[in-house]
Structure formats: structure tokens, C-alpha cells
């Protein structure tokens, strides 16, 4: 009996996490169909899981970045710049794709929803102002509020300062980083239970009946995200690596995107992405910086949301849009998306900025935001999945391309 119990425990702790997550997903759906009160009660499991991920993510970023920079060897190359360019190119490509799809399949809205009382930023300058203030945030406040721009700045600064410390101090920082990484792996093993709770409680409390009125809008939104995830991103990965991109793309969607879909938080998915980077044997000095940076500025899903909902409002009001204006909207949506992490409410609260381009009054723009909140069950989940999975995908693409280049140079040598 004891041997059977230990065998079961070993399968649970060392078995395929993806299969366990799929099992949790199916069980969550079944529970929501069988007993709504029981499904609502399991919401606590999901809340605890997301809370644990959010709690460990800031300290993970701080320790990993600090340790990697403090122990960085002189002359050792990192690949942050090409990854950042891929983030920006991916976000702009997503916005451009959303414009094209919205022109081919124009959507309209029923703007009768009461405007939300959340105040959006006044302009793109205010968004950038908020991001700059995040840079100089108090480090304790940055950790408490999960301000990843502030955490990155302090981690980089401390890392450079600690380069001049003695080896004992560097070893201590490395040990601390390894300890936090161990805790992260422990938390991630509870993903199947957390997703079981999230799925069952979401289906029990909201269902999907409220979404049917916005079926076409949702199809355009999710269709854009599918095109970006399965066509645009693989193309960018291929241009970087010159090899079949789909094994990497599908792995990232499966192991990062699925978890992000249910947690609906790029910050909470940072530990998952870090673990996947380690599994792919990527350069730790690179991914310890690029993953939290991606959670802040790599927002392809947000660019799609801003573009599609803005053009839906434009179509509803009968405002003509020419090609130059549509291209300008792509640029504005990409810039807004990169600042989405610095705005309470994320991408939805940046829609009024894009609407302002077309002279749409703020009252109507806020009704569009309210529509976004209604469809948020699916919109936010898909948006987070594409945002977070792309972080690890582009990081892996650049690292693998660099490894291939070094191997080729070694053969020539």
C-alpha cells in the first residue's frame, strides 16, 4: 500500500505537467456542468494558485537578474537588443494584422452599455510619463506592487554594483536565486489544481451566455490572435533562426500559453516562462532579463485588442478610414500596447487614446471599454496567452540563432 502511494505521488510530482493541466481543465468543465455551487467553491484553489505565482514572480525577477549580472563574465555576450527588436516588431505586426482583418471583416458594436467610471490616461504622453515614473520607483514599493520596470532597474543596478563584490557574496546571491527558483518550481507543480479551480469557478459564475451578443467581434479578435500566433510569429521566428519554427511555437503555446490563458496575468506567468527557458537550456543571463522585460513591453495581444475595438467603434459611427490613417493607428496601437503594463486596466483603458485619433468623444470611447470588460473572459485570456507565450518564443529564437551562429563559426575555425 505504501509503495502504491509513493508511486502515485511520484507520478503526480514528476509526471507531464501539460497532461495534468489538461486533466484539470476537463475536470473543471465537468464540475461546472454537474454542480454550480461546488464549482464556485473551487474558485479558492484558482485564487490561491494565481496569488502564489504573483507573490513569487517579483522576488524571482529581482534575484535572477541581480545574480546573472553580478556573475556575468567579461566578454560574455547577451542578446537583449535583438530580443527587444523582435518584441517591438511583433507588437507592430500584430497591430497591422488587426487593421487588415478588421477591414476584411468589419465589426460593429451596440453602444448602449453604461460607461465605466475608470479614468483613462489623457494621452500617449501620460502613458510614457507613467512608465518613466515606474523606473524611479522605491524598490520596496516596486516589489510590493509588482512594478517590473522598477524591479528590473534596481536589479540591474544592484547587479552591476555587486560585480565588484567578493566571490562569497556572489555565491550567496546565486544560492538565493537558486532557492527562489526551487520555490517557483514547487508552485508551478500546483498548476493543474489551480487551473481546475479557475476553470470551474469561471464557468459557474459567468458562463458564456453574455458573450453571444458579441460573437462576431470575438471571432475577429480571436481570429487576429490566431493569425499572429500561428502565422506572423512563426514567420518572425523563421527569419531569426532559418529553421522550421513550429516545434518551438507549439511548445511555447502549449507550455506557456495554456497557463497564461487561465491565470490571465503576464506577471503571474513569468515563473512559468522562466522554467520553460531553463527546460530549453537557454542562456540564463539573457532570459532572466528578457522574460520580465517582455511581460512589460511585449504586448501583441494588447495591440490587437486596442486596434479591433477602436475600428469596431469607428465602423459603428460610420467614420471613413483611409490607408494612411489605418497605418497610423497600427503605430499608435503598438505604442499604447507597449505602455499597457503601466496603466490600471491594461489594454482596455488605452482604447480611448486610439479612439481620440478619429475624434470619437470620451463618453462613447468608454462605452467601448465597457464592451471590452464584458467580453474580457475570453479577450483577456487569449490576449495574455499570446503576450506571454511570445516572450519565451522570441527569447528562444534569438538564443538558438546565436548558438547556431557560434557553432558555424567554430566549424569554420
UniProtKB/Swiss-Prot annotation:
Pfam families: SDF
Catalytic activity: L-serine(in) + Na(+)(in) = L-serine(out) + Na(+)(out); L-threonine(in) + Na(+)(in) = L-threonine(out) + Na(+)(out)
BP terms from Gene Ontology: serine transport; threonine transport
Domain of life: Bacteria
One Gene Ontology CC term in the entry: plasma membrane
Annotated TM spans: 15-35, 45-65, 85-105, 142-162, 179-199, 218-238, 299-319, 331-351
Keywords: Amino-acid transport, Cell inner membrane, Cell membrane, Membrane, Symport, Transmembrane, Transmembrane helix, Transport
GO molecular function: neutral L-amino acid:sodium symporter activity
Location within or outside the cell: Cell inner membrane
Membrane topology label: Multi-pass membrane protein
Predominant place of localization: membrane
Function of the protein: Involved in the import of serine and threonine into the cell, with the concomitant import of sodium (symport system).
Cross-referenced PANTHER family: PROTON/GLUTAMATE-ASPARTATE SYMPORTER, SERINE_THREONINE TRANSPORTER SSTT
Family as reported in the entry's similarity comment: Belongs to the dicarboxylate/amino acid:cation symporter (DAACS) (TC 2.A.23) family.
Protein name according to UniProt: Serine/threonine transporter SstT
Provenance organism: Enterobacter sp. (strain 638)
Gene: sstT
Amino acid at each position: 500500500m505504501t509503495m502504491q502511494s509513493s508511486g502515485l505521488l511520484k507520478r503526480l510530482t514528476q509526471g507531464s505537467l501539460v497532461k495534468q493541466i489538461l486533466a484539470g481543465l476537463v475536470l473543471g468543465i465537468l464540475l461546472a456542468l454537474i454542480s454550480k455551487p461546488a464549482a464556485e467553491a473551487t474558485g479558492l484553489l484558482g485564487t490561491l494558485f494565481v496569488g502564489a505565482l504573483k507573490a513569487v514572480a517579483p522576488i524571482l525577477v529581482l534575484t535572477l537578474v541581480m545574480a546573472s549580472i553580478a556573475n556575468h563574465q567579461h566578454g560574455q555576450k547577451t542578446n537583449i537588443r535583438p530580443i527587444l527588436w523582435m518584441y517591438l516588431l511583433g507588437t507592430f505586426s500584430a497591430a497591422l494584422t488587426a487593421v487588415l482583418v478588421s477591414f476584411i471583416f468589419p465589426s460593429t458594436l451596440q453602444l448602449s452599455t453604461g460607461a465605466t467610471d475608470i479614468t483613462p490616461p489623457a494621452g500617449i504622453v501620460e502613458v510614457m510619463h507613467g512608465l518613466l515614473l515606474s523606473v524611479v520607483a522605491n524598490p520596496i514599493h516596486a516589489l510590493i506592487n509588482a512594478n517590473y520596470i522598477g524591479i528590473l532597474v534596481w536589479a540591474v543596478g544592484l547587479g552591476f554594483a555587486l560585480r565588484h563584490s567578493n566571490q562569497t557574496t556572489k555565491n550567496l546571491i546565486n544560492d538565493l536565486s537558486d532557492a527562489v527558483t526551487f520555490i517557483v518550481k514547487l508552485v508551478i507543480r500546483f498548476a493543474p489544481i489551480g487551473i481546475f479551480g479557475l476553470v470551474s469557478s469561471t464557468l459557474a459564475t459567468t458562463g458564456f451566455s453574455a458573450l453571444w451578443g458579441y460573437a462576431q467581434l470575438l471571432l475577429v479578435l480571436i481570429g487576429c490572435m490566431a493569425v499572429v500566433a500561428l502565422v506572423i510569429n512563426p514567420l518572425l521566428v523563421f527569419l531569426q533562426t532559418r529553421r522550421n519554427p513550429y516545434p518551438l511555437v507549439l511548445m511555447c503555446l502549449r507550455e506557456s500559453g495554456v497557463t497564461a490563458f487561465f491565470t490571465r496575468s503576464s506577471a503571474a506567468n513569468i515563473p512559468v516562462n522562466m522554467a520553460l527557458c531553463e527546460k530549453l537550456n537557454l542562456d540564463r543571463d539573457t532570459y532572466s532579463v528578457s522574460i520580465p522585460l517582455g511581460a512589460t513591453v511585449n504586448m501583441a495581444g494588447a495591440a490587437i485588442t486596442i486596434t479591433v475595438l477602436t475600428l469596431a467603434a469607428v465602423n459603428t459611427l460610420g467614420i471613413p478610414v483611409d490607408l494612411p490613417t489605418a497605418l497610423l493607428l497600427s503605430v499608435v496601437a503598438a505604442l499604447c500596447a507597449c505602455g499597457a503594463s503601466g496603466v490600471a486596466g491594461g489594454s482596455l483603458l488605452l482604447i480611448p487614446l486610439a479612439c481620440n485619433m478619429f475624434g470619437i468623444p470620451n463618453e462613447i470611447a468608454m462605452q467601448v471599454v465597457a464592451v471590452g470588460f464584458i467580453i474580457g473572459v475570453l479577450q483577456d485570456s487569449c490576449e495574455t496567452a499570446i503576450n506571454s507565450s511570445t516572450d519565451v518564443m522570441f527569447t528562444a529564437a534569438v538564443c538558438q540563432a546565436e548558438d547556431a551562429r557560434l557553432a558555424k563559426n567554430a566549424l569554420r575555425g
